[in-house]
């Protein structure tokens, strides 16, 4: 009984660590999201060729966030980051209507991978500060999110440069990752 109680106590009050994979098309704002969460400031970025990894602390949880480059030629490498991934953050450029179908295809293909079948999905509808940005509801439809039945998912409107919506997304992740444990 002591072991059960200590595990329960740890689950309720202890410090958790969670592995998060952040992906999306190139130019969606993944690296800007990562460093806004980590440093609280906007950093100058260049296209990510490999990956960035940082630990973001939020509400007694250490999120180890792997930000992986989104260029077409790099996407096949994403699968090398799938092992032990508990949550996926898929970042979408809400202002880029010309690539939303490509984003849907990439997301659907990735979600079919067996190694991440138990990972929860958070979609950041990024760049909401731009006047032509699609709403979270429109992106939900265009990505076909309502057809996802095998995992918990959530979409959050965000603006990585201001930080708007980022912590709301982490809040959803922390709640849903606790439920998975």
Swiss-Prot record:
Binding site for GTP: 24-31, 67-71, 126-129
GO molecular function: GTP binding; GTPase activity
Family per record: Belongs to the small GTPase superfamily. Arf family.
Keywords: ER-Golgi transport, Golgi apparatus, GTP-binding, Lipoprotein, Myristate, Nucleotide-binding, Protein transport, Transport
GO terms for cellular component: cytoplasm; Golgi apparatus; plasma membrane
Residues with a covalently attached lipid (N-myristoyl glycine): 2
Example of a GO biological process term: intracellular protein transport
Name this protein carries in UniProt: ADP-ribosylation factor
CDD domains named in the record: Arf1_5_like (cd04150)
Coiled coil regions, renumbered to chain: none
UniProt keyword Acetylation, yes or no: no
Compartment(s): Golgi apparatus
Primary role: GTP-binding protein involved in protein trafficking; may modulate vesicle budding and uncoating within the Golgi apparatus.
Organism: Eremothecium gossypii (strain ATCC 10895 / CBS 109.51 / FGSC 9923 / NRRL Y-1056) (Yeast)
InterPro entries: Arf1-5-like (IPR045872), P-loop_NTPase (IPR027417), Small_GTP-bd (IPR005225), Small_GTPase_ARF (IPR024156), Small_GTPase_ARF/SAR (IPR006689)
